[in-house]
């Protein structure tokens, strides 16, 4: 049973978001001493809130998950846990996480966690996901908050740098999840989820992926031109971003949609990990 409770928190998503939190935290720490205790509180608090949001997502999407091959074996789809207990578990995780952020980190980081939670659970999961192809865009605002939570945990302020970081991760989210929408288009059609690739078609989706990759690359470079990061960051990130742009542009003209979307999906993970690595270590260049 313990394993089932862990599974509904979606550990993979928590780990992925921890990368964003860590990148934002280290980025903001570039001109200050690294606070290990604050870092632990930030990771723990934010991860608990993310886990809570994921559990609520599982609860709300039970009917959808049963229809999709990829999710039909999830814990709640197979009724391995009582819904009431899962609901209480989600509340417990959320309250504990927000308490840690509010009491041991700062009010801004806690507020951002509330913002991200609301966007993901209420706007995305409960409303837009079932009704509009804009759901991915709405959800990307939630997916971008971990970076800023990490940043503001140190800075205790929302500045131009944190806003730029937020925007950059939105562009990454869009390209990343549009690739998923092509990979899993059959599942989304069967579950009647109006993702962009289903509503507008794969051809247009591939063009949009390229558009978002270009924007990610451009806005990333602004960190250097605005004086936040070094030219070493610009050089190294540009190499990776150029190849990502090449892949996404080539994908427009290729026919094997799922294969190429999968390639873009995996490379986008490399991109965001490398990006966070670079902003974390740039102070040493």
UniProtKB/Swiss-Prot annotation:
<dbReference type="InterPro" id="IPR000537">
    <property type="entry name" value="UbiA_prenyltransferase"/>
</dbReference>
<dbReference type="Pfam" id="PF01040">
    <property type="entry name" value="UbiA"/>
</dbReference>
<dbReference type="GO" id="GO:0008495">
    <property type="term" value="F:protoheme IX farnesyltransferase activity"/>
</dbReference>
<feature type="transmembrane region" description="Helical">
    <location>
        <begin position="133"/>
        <end position="153"/>
    </location>
</feature>
<feature type="transmembrane region" description="Helical">
    <location>
        <begin position="8"/>
        <end position="28"/>
    </location>
</feature>
<dbReference type="GO" id="GO:0005886">
    <property type="term" value="C:plasma membrane"/>
</dbReference>
<keyword id="KW-1003">Cell membrane</keyword>
<feature type="transmembrane region" description="Helical">
    <location>
        <begin position="232"/>
        <end position="252"/>
    </location>
</feature>
<comment type="pathway">
    <text>Porphyrin-containing compound metabolism; heme O biosynthesis; heme O from protoheme: step 1/1.</text>
</comment>
<dbReference type="InterPro" id="IPR006369">
    <property type="entry name" value="Protohaem_IX_farnesylTrfase"/>
</dbReference>
<keyword id="KW-0472">Membrane</keyword>
<comment type="function">
    <text>Converts heme B (protoheme IX) to heme O by substitution of the vinyl group on carbon 2 of heme B porphyrin ring with a hydroxyethyl farnesyl side group.</text>
</comment>
<feature type="transmembrane region" description="Helical">
    <location>
        <begin position="209"/>
        <end position="229"/>
    </location>
</feature>
<keyword id="KW-1133">Transmembrane helix</keyword>
<comment type="similarity">
    <text>Belongs to the UbiA prenyltransferase family. Protoheme IX farnesyltransferase subfamily.</text>
</comment>
<feature type="transmembrane region" description="Helical">
    <location>
        <begin position="107"/>
        <end position="127"/>
    </location>
</feature>
<feature type="transmembrane region" description="Helical">
    <location>
        <begin position="265"/>
        <end position="285"/>
    </location>
</feature>
<dbReference type="InterPro" id="IPR030470">
    <property type="entry name" value="UbiA_prenylTrfase_CS"/>
</dbReference>
<dbReference type="InterPro" id="IPR044878">
    <property type="entry name" value="UbiA_sf"/>
</dbReference>
<dbReference type="GO" id="GO:0048034">
    <property type="term" value="P:heme O biosynthetic process"/>
</dbReference>
<feature type="transmembrane region" description="Helical">
    <location>
        <begin position="36"/>
        <end position="56"/>
    </location>
</feature>
<protein>
    <recommendedName>
        <fullName>Protoheme IX farnesyltransferase</fullName>
        <ecNumber>2.5.1.141</ecNumber>
    </recommendedName>
</protein>
<keyword id="KW-0350">Heme biosynthesis</keyword>
<feature type="transmembrane region" description="Helical">
    <location>
        <begin position="80"/>
        <end position="100"/>
    </location>
</feature>
<keyword id="KW-0812">Transmembrane</keyword>
<keyword id="KW-0808">Transferase</keyword>
<feature type="transmembrane region" description="Helical">
    <location>
        <begin position="163"/>
        <end position="183"/>
    </location>
</feature>
């Amino acid at each position: 049973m313990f394993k089932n409770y862990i599974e509904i928190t979606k550990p993979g998503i928590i780990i992925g978001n921890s990368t964003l939190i860590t990148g934002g935290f280290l980025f903001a720490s570039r001109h200050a001493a690294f606070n290990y205790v604050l870092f632990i509180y930030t990771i723990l608090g934010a991860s608990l809130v993310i886990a809570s949001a994921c559990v609520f997502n599982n609860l709300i999407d039970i009917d959808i998950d049963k229809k999709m091959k990829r999710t039909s074996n999830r814990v709640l789809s197979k009724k391995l846990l009582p819904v009431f207990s899962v609901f209480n578990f989600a509340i417990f995780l959320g309250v504990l996480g927000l308490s840690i952020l509010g009491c041991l980190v700062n009010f801004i980081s806690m507020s951002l966690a509330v913002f991200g939670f609301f966007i993901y659970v209420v706007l995305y999961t409960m409303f837009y996901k079932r009704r509009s192809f804009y759901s991915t865009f709405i959800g990307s605002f939630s997916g971008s908050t971990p970076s800023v939570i990490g940043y503001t945990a140190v800075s205790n302020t929302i500045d131009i740098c944190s806003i730029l970081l937020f925007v950059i991760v939105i562009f990454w989210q869009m390209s990343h999840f549009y690739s998923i929408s092509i990979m899993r288009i059959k599942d989304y059609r069967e579950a009647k989820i109006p993702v962009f690739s289903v509503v507008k078609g794969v051809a247009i989706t591939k063009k949009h992926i390229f558009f978002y990759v270009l924007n990610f690359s451009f806005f990333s470079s602004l960190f250097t031109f605005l004086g936040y990061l070094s030219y070493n960051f610009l050089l190294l990130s540009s190499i990776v971003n150029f190849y990502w742009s090449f892949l996404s542009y080539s994908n427009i003209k290729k026919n094997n949609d799922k294969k190429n979307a999968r390639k873009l999906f995996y490379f986008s993970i490399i991109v965001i990990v490398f990006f966070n690595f670079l902003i974390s270590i740039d102070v040493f260049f």
